[in-house]
């Protein structure tokens, strides 16, 4: 019974880890696509503004279906080929596609913020803590070694 439960835990753990890794990679990839589309649309580089502009633009597109066809191109670059809005179901497809892109970009940006927030302490603390421990451990050892060496040298010298 214990071995079977342990094997089940072993089986379950890599699966969950793989799913988490795949989800994070997908969110990051979506964020890269969104960044490229924003640069094509020549929108500001700050992260909150493109989301708001994209939502406002989609609302405008729903209210005014007679806009030029060149404007939805940045949106089409984000969506897969099967999700591209056809002229008949443009409003429903854009509203359905607006939520996943914004949420995926928000998740990716949150993940990037978490990574950026976590990496500097992780990069800074390991050099500090081993240096502190090495210094605190090495200084008494140095003094002790100097004392023992000097006393031994004195013994051997005498």
Swiss-Prot record:
UniProt record, GO biological process: segmentation
Annotated spans, Disordered: 18-96, 118-158
Primary location: nucleus
Entry protein name: Protein hunchback
Its job: Gap class segmentation protein that controls development of head structures.
Compositional bias segments (type: Basic and acidic residues): 139-158
Annotated GO MF terms: DNA binding; zinc ion binding
Compositional bias segments (type: Low complexity): 52-65
Compartments, record wording: Nucleus
Composition-biased stretches (Polar residues): 41-50
Compositionally skewed regions (Basic residues) per UniProt: 18-34
Gene Ontology cellular-component annotations: nucleus
UniProt keyword terms in alphabetical order: Developmental protein, DNA-binding, Gap protein, Metal-binding, Nucleus, Repeat, Zinc, Zinc-finger
Domain of life: Eukaryota
Family: Belongs to the hunchback C2H2-type zinc-finger protein family.
